[in-house]
Regions:
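Acyl-donor binding region in acyl/amide transferases
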Residues: 45-46, 52, 67-150, 268-326, ...
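A conserved beta-strand-loop-helix scaffold within acyl/acetyltransferase catalytic domains
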Residues: 2-80, 126-155, 159-284, 382-394
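Short, surface-exposed, polar/charged, turn-prone segments marking secondary-structure boundaries
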Residues: 78, 89-91, 150-154, 183-186, ...
Length: 394
């Protein structure tokens, strides 16, 4: 077995055929990975670990070297920001087939990279609870230079009804009347002006991005530095997935203006939800729920049978999801003074965050506090639907 690292875009071409054969998620898509490495200023280079056996790649760890700000959060607050070089292994970034031997040797290889000074830390973003790498990283910890015990989050999926009619199959009867009333109220408030548009073909990507930006600019995600933004990266991402026929966008237009949106990507038969936003003036009509119902009906018509809600838990995911698993982000820190300092800071802030969450959960006001913080972070006079947050590192 041989393990090495690719650190240039040119070298990536040597494993491209294997990568594209194994890719199964928008996050680990080769073309998108390459695009992000080219566009994001914080990305110093690719850092892809290649595991070979008998001269052929057996597996890949898709990562990037990033000059970033190490900023462990307490809730939505990031009290410290420390410049650091981090090797970020993407969510769903483990490609190919790995056995126990390959996993153990790969973990040792990653520690050797840290000892050599390649990075101050390595981040495995949201490893699944059944990942062999998670088990190996937990078993072969290196004392002070591993992160605290796992902080789990729940990842949800949903099976779509084959015959459509999402509201009939997934919404309880006592809620259907209320949802239909909200829809009638919306139509009454804007008679003849409401249009729901499902888009799977795109002729004007820049124009579409500009229209979405009118809504996204007022969303709370913008205050967090997440969510959709009309920039070169999103335009090229839309062009990439739209050109393949994988991009889907649900729009609510009123009098020709976009007032709400939700988009995602169909990838190997699974729809991956991405970003959403809506005009806060429409909050009383629960347009997030109305969009979600239409989106699922349109997907069912196309033959899509699985919807992936993406990273993180939320009330609507628990309400509609029918399959879930746990995930956690794992950090390894370089055996240096800086690595130790980063580890200690993460341990302290994680302990404060955990204590605060436990207190808030016992009081029973966690959801209310989340909503309040999101509204506070949103630009003045606006917010996005607090029950529909979407963030995912790619």
């Amino acid at each position: 077995m041989k393990i090495g690292t690719i650190k240039t875009l040119e070298e990536l071409e040597a494993v491209r055929a294997y990568w594209e054969r194994w890719q199964d998620h928008p996050n680990n898509d080769f073309a998108q990975f390459k695009m992000v490495c080219q566009l994001r200023p914080e990305v110093e280079s690719p850092c892809v670990v290649v595991i070979e056996r008998n001269g052929q790649p057996q597996a890949l760890l898709a990562g990037r070297l990033e000059k970033t700000q190490f900023a462990p959060p307490i809730g939505y607050i990031k009290p410290v920001r420390i410049p650091a070089k981090v090797m970020a292994v993407l969510h769903e970034g483990i490609l190919g087939q790995v056995d126990d031997e390959a996993v153990l040797e790969s973990v040792e290889y990653l520690w050797s990279l840290l000892r050599s000074g390649v990075a101050d830390a390595i981040e495995f973003h949201h490893l699944s609870e059944d990942s062999p790498f998670l088990n190996a990283l937990q078993l072969h910890r290196s004392g002070w230079f591993c992160d605290p015990p796992p902080r789990w989050s729940v990842h949800w999926e949903m099976t779509l009804p084959a015959e459509g009619a999402f509201i009939e199959h997934k919404v309880r009867s006592k809620h259907r009347t209320g949802i239909r009333k909200k829809e009638r109220d919306l139509e009454s408030a804007f008679p003849g002006k409401v249009s729901w548009r499902w888009m799977n073909r795109f002729d004007d990507i820049p124009g579409m991005c500009a229209r979405l930006e009118e809504v996204a600019a007022r969303a709370y995600q913008r205050g967090l530095g997440t969510g959709f933004m009309d920039n070169e990266e999103y335009r090229r991402r839309f062009a990439l997935f739209g050109g393949r026929g994988q991009l889907r966008i649900q729009l609510l237009e009123i009098d020709g203006r976009v007032r709400a949106f939700w988009f995602g990507y169909v990838y190997q038969g699974v729809f991956h939800l991405s970003e959403t936003g809506y005009d806060p003036e429409l909050s009383k009509y629960e347009v997030g729920t109305l969009m979600f119902i239409r989106l699922n009906d349109e997907l069912a018509k196309e033959g899509v049978r699985t919807l992936d809600f993406g990273i993180g838990d939320a009330l609507y995911k628990r309400r509609f999801g029918d399959r879930s698993w746990q995930e956690t982000t794992v950090w390894l820190f370089a055996p240096t003074a800086k690595g130790l300092a980063l580890r200690l800071i993460m341990g302290l802030l994680s302990a404060v965050d955990k204590f605060g969450r436990n207190v808030i959960q016992r009081i029973g006001i966690l959801d209310q506090l989340k909503t309040g913080w999101r509204r506070r972070l949103a630009p003045r006079k606006s917010s996005a639907d607090p029950e529909y947050p979407m963030t995912e590192k790619i």
